[in-house]
Amino acid sequence: MATKIRLKRQGKKFYAFYRVVVVDSRKKRDGKVIEEIGTYNPNTQPSTIQIKSDRAQYWLGVGAQPSEPVFKLLNITGDWQKYKGLEGAEGTLKTVEAGPDAEARIAAVEDQAQKLKAAKSEAAAKAKAEAEAAAAAEEAPAEEAAEEAPAEA
């Protein structure tokens, strides 16, 4: 059976992501697969590539042919170089580095959210106090007018 390693499209319109799959070469693009060996999401920055290296090595070893896009992904992850025994088996996969400033940014956002909550609650309390004071001010003249007016019987 002629097997290929290729991409299976997932996602929705204008937001596609792919699964790296091993499939019989005669099957449809999104047809039944033999094994899923990874994922590829081009929508993130940088693109997310996750391939099970041991399974990719196995399928390449038994003769599965990668499609052109999968060949490029295998080069980026270093699996193709490892399979061929070439230099640069570590690959050129870019990763998002969290870094030390990421925690500081998260803390700053949380502090800002708490300050915003406090400001909103203070504004609500102030508005409520003003409304109560205005209501009390309206009731006082009405009571005085009622006392001054003679009662008709």
UniProtKB/Swiss-Prot annotation:
Keywords: Ribonucleoprotein, Ribosomal protein. It comes from the Bacteria. InterPro entries: Ribosomal_bS16, Ribosomal_bS16_CS, Ribosomal_bS16_dom_sf. GO terms for biological process: translation. The keyword Ribonucleoprotein applies. GO terms for molecular function: structural constituent of ribosome. Residues 130-153 are annotated as: Disordered. PROSITE patterns: RIBOSOMAL_S16. One of its GO terms (cellular component) is cytoplasm. The keyword Ribosomal protein applies. Belongs to the bacterial ribosomal protein bS16 family. This is Small ribosomal subunit protein bS16. It comes from Bifidobacterium longum (strain NCC 2705).
